[in-house]
Swiss-Prot record:
It comes from the Bacteria. There is a cross-link at S58-C68 (Lanthionine (Ser-Cys)). Keywords: Antibiotic, Antimicrobial, Bacteriocin, Lantibiotic, Lipid-binding, Secreted, Thioether bond. Transmembrane segments: none annotated. The modification 2,3-didehydrobutyrine is found at T43, T47. The keyword Secreted applies. This is Lantibiotic Flvalpha.a. It is found in: Secreted. One of its GO terms (molecular function) is lipid binding. Lanthionine-containing peptide antibiotic (lantibiotic) only active on Gram-positive bacteria in synergy with Flvbeta peptides, which are encoded by the same operon than Flvalpha.a. Shows antibacterial activity in synergy with Flvbeta.b, Flvbeta.c, Flvbeta.e and Flvbeta.g. Does not show antibacterial activity when tested with Flvbeta.a, Flvbeta.d, Flvbeta.f and Flvbeta.h. The bactericidal activity of lantibiotics is based on depolarization of energized bacterial cytoplasmic membranes, initiated by the formation of aqueous transmembrane pores. One of its GO terms (cellular component) is extracellular region. It comes from Ruminococcus flavefaciens. One of its GO terms (biological process) is defense response to bacterium.
Length: 80
């Protein structure tokens, strides 16, 4: 008999109060895949929407349209 409850067979899982742990983990992973695996089209749309919202918020906060990063070269020009 295997002591790890995840690797127990169905016969050995009958005496466990929580049931078959491996089947429950498989169901959970399938549910997460369904939630996270919405498809590449939705991912692209979400990325574009988030970028657009980020640009609008940045413009609303006073960014004059310059794209600045945290690099050393750009930090000097952004502080002007």
């Amino acid at each position: 008999m295997n002591k790890n409850p995840i690797y127990r067979s169905e016969e050995e899982a009958k005496d466990i109060a929580c049931g078959n742990v491996a089947a429950e983990l498989d169901e959970n992973s399938q549910a997460l895949d369904a939630i996270n695996g919405a498809g590449w089209k939705q991912t692209i749309v979400c990325t574009i929407a988030q970028g657009t919202v980020g640009c609008l918020v940045s413009y609303g906060l006073g960014n004059g349209g310059y794209c600045c990063t945290y690099t050393v070269e750009c930090s000097k020009t952004c502080n002007k």
